[in-house]
Amino acid sequence: MNVIHINFKMKSREYSKLFGCNIYGFIRVTSMAQKIIDTSEFQRLRNMKQLGLCYLVFPAATHTRLEHSIGVYDRTRKVIERIYRQYPDREYYIPELSDKPIKLDAKIIECIKIAGLCHDIGHGPFSHVFDDVLLTDIDHPNKHHEIRSCLITEIICKRELSNELNDKHIDFIKSIINPTSSHKGAIYQIVSNNLNGIDVDKFDYLARDSKNLNIGSEFNASRLINEFIIDKNNNIAYPKQCCFDIDEMYNSRYCMHKKVYSHKTVKLLEMMLKDIFTLIDPIFKISETINDMDQFCKLTDNSIFELISTTINPRPFIKINIEPDQFMAIKKANTIYQNILSRKLYKQITEINENNGGKALCEKFIEYITNKHPNIKNSLYLFKTVRGFIGGNKNPFGQIYFYDKMEDDNSFTMPECHFAGLINKGTQEVTWHIYCKDSKILDLARFEVKNFFNTLE
């Protein structure tokens, strides 16, 4: 693997360790990065599966947040060192560091790489499931993993890198992890690109997820990484020929959501986990750990199930004080957990695309069936899945900049007609699902679905 060695006079940037990677070969990290990797907060990511509950449907989906984070570190290194090599005298506006535009130096580059390394360190158990499913009813700024990543990164940097980084550097790292709308320009488009979603985080997880699950993907980020420029407006721009590579990237994301991330069985498992969480959170206060990063960093994918198992089957040397009603709630949670292990899962009885009535039609069906069978309502689950090019509902295509290799001084956007695939369908696909929790009424529910749709004809 070729490594760009920039002649920086900074001892802390000496390469210190080599990691094997099934995507990029070998990855070298600096001594500053190694100090972060060797913390308990970062090592916790070994016990955090990248794809949450997907491993219960796809046995190979066991790769972790740790390997993804190191992969993003390497892709960040490749991009930022290429920027330095191509534009050694260019100045950038970095408000956390200076009121005036400044040139890149060794420490700034190291900060950007650290941001890539730590961008996911704030994930909770089962990754996105923790925020998007388990904490949906919680109103707190720390419910978002990007915010927690910033908080944990600050804790680590102040503890482990106090001799290398000051408060301004730490604030800069946090702004790269979670940029706001005021953070403009190429520097803030590397790790987490709010402009159009083209960033090294996406490059790595698409490559890593498809590789580990053996799902073919036509997207390869190499051309985008090796051919971009920074235009006169300080945005990253790509050769106009790369519009097809970018289209493949967006389509790969959509396909991974369709095939894996939003697979119907994955989603019903998430609903079962939510029911478990609803039962035990009032007892164990798991959601309250987002107020205390020291406590939060003790959580892993195993935490929720271990709390249940330890309470139901306590070891002789562990004393647990649980009220009778609390114990009954934990027993109910354990029943759901055992059903997951024995594949006695919730079942989907119907799904309706938003364009065909979506939520309104699903709610109408629930009203229809509960009028006929009042006791069935608590056994039905209404759930929405969203699949698309990027997170959110904004169209990214008008924010992607291209250049002509014969005239690279000026960048431009391309009309949407230049992009193929899902662009003709819009940037998001919303589907509403109804799940049945009780296997005893499954046949009845499916029978009533047929009756309901017959009444609409």
Swiss-Prot record:
Q: Which GO terms describe its biological process?
A: dGTP catabolic process
Q: Could you tell me which InterPro entries the record lists for this protein?
A: dGTPase-like, HD/PDEase_dom, HD_domain
Q: Which ranges carry the HD domain?
A: 65-206
GO MF, one term, reads: dGTPase activity
Q: Which domain of life is it from?
A: Viruses
Spell out the protein name for this chain.
Putative HD domain-containing protein L394
Organism of origin: Acanthamoeba polyphaga mimivirus
